[in-house]
Every structure is written in structure tokens, then in C-alpha cells.
UniProtKB/Swiss-Prot annotation:
GO terms for molecular function: ATP binding; identical protein binding; protein serine kinase activity; protein serine/threonine kinase activity; protein serine/threonine/tyrosine kinase activity; protein tyrosine kinase activity. Residues 1-67, 101-143 are annotated as: Disordered. This is Dual specificity protein kinase CLK2. It holds the Pfam family Pkinase. One of its GO terms (cellular component) is nuclear body. ATP binds at residues 169-177, 193. 5,6-dichloro-1-b-D-ribofuranosylbenzimidazole (DRB) inhibits autophosphorylation. TG003 inhibits its kinase activity and affects the regulation of alternative splicing mediated by phosphorylation of SR proteins. The gene is CLK2. It comes from Homo sapiens. The modification Phosphotyrosine is found at residues 99, 153.
Length: 499
């Protein structure tokens, strides 16, 4: 890339010819040029790397999609998929261009530095409590953000004279989650979600808070298995949300267990709770839109270790399969605007891909994909390309209904009323070798296994109007033994009733 500041404007207007002036400073210019090109190459490489993390197309079209289903590969491959696939919802279309322009502008660093200083001075003048102590005033003066907008904190720091930070639990594009001691709740441990000081993430947090407040209002006793919000506040530009402290996500437990599938009795209990929780949302005219194993957390992820003689390795078995549904940042009420694209790629319903409009049935499709993943240990649709995704659906579930094909605006995926897909290409061979009809994934011919796949098939019905509702799902024969359990025993987080 050319260096726009290679020659200073003052040199152009100096006395003597341009060539003579250049020769007189030739040695110095060479030194400056080599240093500049080296640092620019480093900055350019960092900028390109960061762009690949943000870019949707740079991942969707990569040859890595052709790889076979490697379970460890699947875990890293899906990590940041949601923000890539959402596109404009999370990253402006002109974000990269403005970023490069600013990096090349000579005055950008000084402007950014002055803005940071101004922001810090403004923060130092704020007061969040009339009864603030001298200790909290000293803390307020030291509040700073890192380059990405994360709050800089240390173990032992206090927020709002209430939350004492104990450890970091995780990090995402939105911010970080820390474990805290809540000194107004008798020293109880809570999870505190600290949002980046970036406006689009702060706005998403406000929307999530609105949803969580409605959930608390409708379910004050927290009987419907959605994560409970205790409190929220604005801390120096960072939206903070306090939740009940939970265990690992069902995906992280699966990954830590070498992608060993959950036993069918545990699949049954987790699936039943998931249907119950999401049915509660649907009954209150709310669609989650981002259901996936990462957003389903164990209440307590303690486990027992057993040694598998056949595989010669330790295997984990979670002690309690009680779960909670989390992450309502994308949840949408029926009356609100519906974004064109929702859901993480692997759990995205066909009506979303084909842009036919969506509502609660898209959650049911996601649940079907999740239950399958619990049963086999890997994702059903491992892809990042729309056409390939549709080809996988046809390979596993049969042809897409002609009525959906006629209605969609995405005619580029079809030819003469059928999916435009060549099985003789590398992509075609990949789908043919790694996907098979749904029932061929059965690991046992026992009746309960066939009942499970009957449930999954009903959830993966192409047409939303024909797809199983969650009220109907809870009455499915696969859940018969759980329906016989008293409610107080069914949701007891200290007891595993799935065996």
C-alpha cells in the first residue's frame, strides 16, 4: 500500500529543485522510509487480521468449509459466527473503510488521545451516589477503558459500593462477565455482565434489560427456567447487569468432555426444560432468536469422573442436568421490528435463510438442532454458506417444499423450481460424504431413541406452519416419564431426576 505521507508538504515548497532537495536528504529519507514501511506492514497485517475476524464473507467462502466434521474444529469454527453472520446488525457496512482511513490520517492518533482524555475528565466529574464514601471517590477517579471499550478492572475492585469483583468468568464481543460478591445480598455470589462502553452494545444491553424486566414481572418466582436478573446499573458508561451465578454452558461442558454426547436420559431432561422455558417466552409473545448450546447453562456443572476402558480415557458425567436459558440480547416481541437475519448459522431456520419472515417457529427449529447436538456430540449443519446449508437440509431432511421456493426472493439459490446444487463439485462431495438422512444418525434401535428422532423430525419441519409447537412438544411420548414427576421435584436443581 503506498505511503501517503512519504514527502512532507514543507519540502515541496522549499528553495531549489525538488530533485536536489531529495538528494540532499537521501540517506535520512531511506532510513525513515524503511522504518515506516516496516511499521506500516505490521499495522496493516494487524488491521487485515482484525478485519477477517469481523468479516462475514472471508469465513463463509473459505476452503476450510470443505473439512470433514472434526469435533475440535467445530468448536473453534463456530466461536464468533453470530456476529459475522448478522452482518449489518453488528458491524456497519462501511466500518472497515472508515477504520483504514482513520489509521492513515496523520492527525488521527492525537485526536483520539484528546478525545480519551476529555472522556476521562468527564467521567471523573460524575457522581453516582449522594452518599459516596471517600473510598468510592478515589475508585471513580481511576476508572478507565481499554482500546476496545472494555472496563479495566482488577480483582478486589468494588462497583456501586456493592459488588466486589472476584474473578473473570468469560468474554464476548459485548463485554465481559465477572463473578462478584453482592454485599447487599448477604455476600451471595452473582454473575455481573459488564458491557463495553460502545453505543451499539449499550443499546443492545438496554433492550436485553427491557426483556429481562418483563420476564421478572411475568415470572417473579423464576419457575420458568430463564436466567434471573437481580439488578442493573450504568457504571461510567458501562451498562452492568447482575444475574444469578450459573455453571458451564451445555456446549462448554460438551467441549471439555471431548465432545462425548450426553446420555439419552440427560438429553431428555435438558430438552424438556428447554421446551418449557421457551414455551414461556412464546406464551408471552417473545421470540428468543438465538438459541444454541452456548446459551443454555447448567445451574451447577459439577461432574463425576469415570474411566472408559474401551476408549482409555476419563469421561465426565454432570451430576445435575438442571439448566437455564440465557442471553436475551436478541429477543424480539411480536409487535417489534423483526430483523431479516437472526440466529447463529448452525441453528438458523430455512424461512430465515430464504427471507420468508419468521416468528416463534424459528426457535423450535433451533431447539431441534440443539437436541440433535446433545445426542451425537456435533452440529447437524456444519457450514457457513447459505446454498450449502440448504443442500445439507435436503440431504438430511428431504427436498425443500416447492411452495417455499416459489415464495422466496432468494431465487439465485434455485433453478427451475429446484435447489441449484452440483453434487460433483468439492462442495457437493463434502455434503454427500458428511451428511446423511436423519434417522441414520440413530445410535440405538431402542424405542426411546426412535421417539427422540420423531420429536426432532417434527421440530425440523421445513414449513413453519407445520412445525411442532412447544406445547405439543411437551406432550410428546419422549417426555412421558418426566410429565409424571411432581413439579417441585422436576425443577429441583440439587437433584438429577433424569436417570
Amino acid at each position: 500500500m503506498p505511503h501517503p505521507r512519504r514527502y512532507h508538504s514543507s519540502e515541496r515548497g522549499s528553495r531549489g529543485s525538488y530533485r536536489e532537495h531529495y538528494r540532499s536528504r537521501k540517506h535520512k529519507r531511506r532510513r525513515s522510509r524503511s522504518w515506516s514501511s516496516s511499521s506500516d506492514r505490521t499495522r496493516r497485517r494487524r488491521r487485515e487480521d482484525s478485519y477477517h475476524v469481523r468479516s462475514r464473507s472471508s469465513y463463509d467462502d473459505r476452503s476450510s468449509d470443505r473439512r470433514v466434521y472434526d469435533r475440535r474444529y467445530c468448536g473453534s469454527y463456530r466461536r464468533n459466527d453470530y456476529s459475522r453472520d448478522r452482518g449489518d446488525a453488528y458491524y456497519d457496512t462501511d466500518y472497515r473503510h472508515s477504520y483504514e482511513y482513520q489509521r492513515e490520517n496523520s492527525s488521527y492518533r492525537s485526536q483520539r488521545s484528546s478525545r480519551r482524555k476529555h472522556r476521562r475528565r468527564r467521567r471523573r466529574s460524575r457522581t453516582f451516589s449522594r452518599s459516596s464514601s471517600q473510598h468510592s471517590s478515589r475508585r471513580a477517579k481511576s476508572v478507565e477503558d481499554d482500546a476496545e471499550g472494555h472496563l479495566i478492572y482488577h480483582v478486589g475492585d468494588w462497583l456501586q459500593e456493592r459488588y466486589e469483583i472476584v474473578s473473570t468468568l468469560g468474554e464476548g464481543t459485548f463485554g465481559r462477565v465477572v463473578q462478584c460478591v453482592d454485599h447487599r445480598r448477604g455476600g451471595a455470589r452473582v454473575a455481573l455482565k459488564i458491557i463495553k462502553n460502545v453505543e451499539k452494545y449499550k443499546e443492545a444491553a438496554r433492550l436485553e434489560i427491557n426483556v429481562l424486566e418483563k420476564i421478572n414481572e411475568k415470572d417473579p418466582d423464576n419457575k420458568n427456567l430463564c436466567v434471573q436478573m437481580f439488578d442493573w446499573f450504568d457504571y461510567h458508561g458501562h451498562m452492568c447487569i447482575s444475574f444469578e451465578l450459573l455453571g458451564l454452558s451445555t456446549f462448554d461442558f460438551l467441549k471439555d468432555n471431548n465432545y462425548l454426547p450426553y446420555p439419552i436420559h440427560q438429553v431428555r431432561h435438558m430438552a424438556f426444560q428447554l421446551c418449557q422455558a421457551v414455551k414461556f417466552l412464546h406464551d408471552n409473545k417473545l421470540t428468543h432468536t438465538d438459541l444454541k448450546p452456548e446459551n443454555i447453562l447448567f445451574v451447577n456443572s459439577d461432574y463425576e469422573l469415570t474411566y472408559n476402558l474401551e476408549k482409555k480415557r476419563d469421561e465426565r458425567s454432570v451430576k445435575s442436568t438442571a439448566v437455564r436459558v440465557v442471553d436475551f440480547g436478541s429477543a424480539t416481541f411480536d409487535h417489534e421490528h423483526h430483523s431479516t437475519i437472526v440466529s447463529t448459522r448452525h441453528y438458523r431456520a430455512p424461512e430465515v435463510i430464504l427471507e420468508l419472515g419468521w416468528s416463534q417457529p424459528c426457535d423450535v427449529w433451533s431447539i431441534g438442532c440443539i437436541i440433535f447436538e446433545y445426542y451425537v456430540g456435533f452440529t447437524l449443519f456444519q457450514t457457513h454458506d447459505n446454498r450449502e446449508h440448504l443442500a445439507m437440509m435436503e440431504r438430511i431432511l428431504g427436498p425443500i417444499p416447492s411452495r417455499m421456493i416459489r415464495k422466496t426472493r432468494k431465487q439465485k439459490y434455485f433453478y427451475r423450481g429446484r435447489l441449484d446444487w452440483d453434487e460433483n463439485t468439492s462442495a457437493g462431495r463434502y455434503v454427500r460424504e458428511n451428511c446423511k438422512p436423519l434417522r441414520r444418525y440413530l445410535t440405538s434401535e431402542a424405542e426411546e431413541h426412535h421417539q427422540l428422532f420423531d420429536l426432532i423430525e417434527s421440530m425440523l419441519e421445513y414449513e413453519p406452519a407445520k412445525r411442532l409447537t412447544l406445547g405439543e412438544a411437551l406432550q410428546h411420548p419422549f417426555f412421558a416419564r418426566l410429565r409424571a414427576e411432581p413439579p417441585n421435584k422436576l425443577w429441583d436443581s440439587s437433584r438429577d431426576i433424569s436417570r
